[in-house]
Amino acid sequence: RVTGLSTAPGNGYATLGSGTRAVAPALIAGAAFGQLELLEAGTAAEAFARRSGRPLAGAIGQVNTNALRDNNSSSSFGGELGALGDRLAEGGVSRGVVGNADWALRFVGTTDLPRREAALALMDQHGEVPCGVVDQSLLVKDADYAFGLRLDHDRVISAFSHCWRGRSVVLVEASDLRRADDYRAFVSSERSDVIEKQALENADSLVGQLLDSVDLERDAVVVVAPSSRSGRVAHLNLFAVHAPRMGTGLLRSSVTRQNSFVSIVDVAPTVAALAGTPQDEGEVEGRPVTISRRGGTPEGRLETLVDANTDAVFRDRVLFPF
């Protein structure tokens, strides 16, 4: 959670990239583009240079970085956008982002804004990500999916493989899940359940394909839900880590000081530590996670988390009924 019970994608991804709570208003949070995408009266690279005063050297540029920085300067949290990206770059770790949660193949009006907030998680302070793809080349038309669009897994895997070289951190967004959740506002609950189930199965398939490119004896894999589901009731989100020599059990951090509970601000310090480039504890709100309860069965740990979520939802409904 960042500003309230529910976390919007912009706030969530901005916080993932900061290690401290950060904000990114929806109207400007998703404006990440590849260099040659069309924007304003030219390319995104030209718009980036015009708005920032510096050329776009990376594959991806967030053209609203200055406005986002102003929003955080005036917030009460003190989040530094791009802190994780800067730390990884300083440590010689390359970065990549792959994903596109757009609703439409062209932007008309405020409902069809670009939804590429994922770039906020690994961009540097200037709004650049050196590798990756966030444009609509990742999408194919599919009438059975939310908004008639879904990710092309072959293109996602290709973009991931291009960035997954040497020491690197690559974020891949299961964007079909994001679109399916956004689509809840336009369909019945029954249709929403069908569409979400299909998106979840598709995301599971994508994760399986990505894991084929990963050496689990050498590489770390982090799974995180950066934002809340749409709707009034907020649920706890998932954060899971598989890393060499980490062992199995439930996570905790010195922020929450509770077994099986961590905070969204703990994600950036955890990723930085796993990459061998730890963030300065004096500069971020979060802390790297540790294993709190070892042993047990996967089924038992899952039951613990399900019960914790049920309790959290009940507590929120009692404390915040409206």
Show which residues each predicted segment covers:
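Selective detector of the "anchor" transmembrane alpha-helix that sits immediately C-terminal
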Residues: 317-322
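Soluble extramembrane regions of membrane proteins in the secretory/endomembrane system
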Residues: 1-314
